[in-house]
Amino acid sequence: MKERYNMTQNLFTEEELAKVTDRAERKHLIECAQDQSKIDLQYMKIMEKYDLWEKGSRSRYFHATTHENAEKIMQDGVIRKGMDGGVYICKQPLEAARFVAIRGHETGTIFEVELEDRKVFEAHDHNEEFFGCKAYMYTDDIPTAKVVKISRYSTKED
C-alpha cells in the first residue's frame, strides 16, 4: 500500500513526493501536510513547480457575494482571488452567505463551485466562533467553468 501524507483534504503519494527533487522543498511540503496552518506562498510555488495541483479529488464549495459583484464575475468569466492570495469559500451555502450578510448586505448571490481539494485550505484569519463556521480559501482564481449552480438569496425577515 502506498504511503499517504494527509492534510485533512490534501494528500501526497510517495510518487508525488518523489517528483520534488529539492530536499528543502520536499520537507516544506511534508510540514504543510502535517500542519495545514503552515501553508504559505512557498507551498503554492512548490506545488506549481512540480505540477502537483490538478490531481486528486474534487469537492463542492460555496462562494457568496453581492449581486453587483456576481454580475461582474459573470461578465469577466472568473471569480478573482483577492489581495490575500485566494478566493474565500465555505462548505455550506448559508455559511458563505454569513460573510456577505455581516457586511450589511441582506441579499446576495451564491456560486456553487467544484474545486480541486488540493488548492483548498482552511483560512485562519476568520474567527470561527464569531461566524459560526470555518472559512476556507481556494488558492487561485475560479473560472466560471467551475461553477455548477448560481443561486440568489435573501436574509431579510418577512
Regions found by a protein language model. Name each.
Residues 5-85, 101-102:
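ADP-ribose/NAD+-binding catalytic cleft of ART/PARP-like enzymes
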Residues 8-32, 40, 80-82, 104-158:
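Active-site and NAD+-binding cores of ADP-ribose-processing enzymes
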Residues 64-70, 91, 113-119:
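Short, flexible beta-strand-to-coil junctions
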Residues 72, 97-99, 122-123:
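Short helix/loop capping segments that flank catalytic or ligand/cofactor-binding pockets
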Residues 89-107:
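Short, intrinsically disordered low-complexity segments
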